[in-house]
From Swiss-Prot:
Its cofactor is Zn(2+). The active site is at residues 91, 294. It comes from the Archaea. GO terms for cellular component: cytosol. Keywords: Glycosyltransferase, Metal-binding, Transferase, tRNA processing, Zinc. Residues 275-281, 299-303 are annotated as: RNA binding. It catalyses: 7-aminomethyl-7-carbaguanine + guanosine(34) in tRNA = 7-aminomethyl-7-carbaguanosine(34) in tRNA + guanine. This is Putative queuine tRNA-ribosyltransferase.
Amino acid sequence: MPLKFRIKHTLDRMRVGKVKTRHGSFETPVFIPVATLAAIRGLDNRDLKDMGVEVILANTYHLHLRPGDELIKELGGLHKFMNFDGVIVTDSGGFQAFSLGFGMEHGVGKIANNIFLEELREERLREAENERKKLAVVTDRGVRFKDPKSGRIVELTPKKSMEIQSNLGSDIIFAFDECTSPLSDRDYTEKALERTHRWAEECLQHYDRRQALFGVVQGGEYRDLREKSARFMAERDFAGYGIGGSLGKSKQDMLNILDWVIPLLPEEKPRHLLGIGAIEDLFNCTEKGVDMYDCVAPARWARRGHLYVSPAEGGNVRNKFRIHIKNAAFRIDNRPVDRTCDCLVCQNYSRAYLRHLYKANELLYFRLATYHNIYFVVKLMERIRESIADGSFYELKREWLGF
């Protein structure tokens, strides 16, 4: 078996587990940093090891374009290529169909939030006229991408996705799926779900048996479609299950989707909530039974000047547990970013110094900020695991979220 999952502790719907693969193991629930192009900007593998990062996620679509999955295979696979001795997860490339297509056109993500939904839904009817402008177009066969750098057309199909992920040599791979928009109506979501299910069957036929294949539950905000998809995936021999977007119009919609889906998935297999990683979500979704998360947010927010802080430093749901280091208040602030954090940044540098680096656009800022944010989330997940094991999760959640 390319993957073994052992549940060590449970608390209500939560579990602490251990995933074992051919390139090592990791504890769950886990936050997985995203190394899109086989790298996390500003960090090297020694940094990841120092943080305790045991698993990363790389992007199939982007690595296929550059440097090319066949080249990576020639060089011994991703582990050797990037000299990483931990577990590597690759996505299927399906999310790019959304982010480079409808998502790019309308500027929305997996959760719609405060946008003019009905007005934008009407635009779906005019999509055919605008397809030439998009970088990605979905068909029943797969997805056609326009490489934004070279302009060449690339077609990604379920079989091709499995081939690329095999060449990359990752440990955990995902079935090719269509991630619909929060703006998609029921008719489109249902058709997309039928495609996702057909593509999942194709992936089961063509994937590399040395890898652990996860199926992806889709269905948008519609309960019956989500439940249909969860049952479909649960009946197939996947090593684990991803829960994909769209995740509705609000955080509550996302939690409702987890309530519908998770009870229908096999208890003995891991569940991965794709593309989610906000501090609030790590608590609330773990409470629903999620085991794995991946998200670019910690690194992306770091580059934009937002650094994570704990409740002891004023972090809360309203400020999303972040301070913006460019604020003038930090100009003469000799405190570390977070006095409760023992990362190398908080042990050695002040807020004033980090603000100076950020304002001066110094490269060192990006390394230090990214290090702090990823370390912060990785260590928070350690605390969450410990709290599930010793029964103190709800106290920890109350300390952080206030409820």
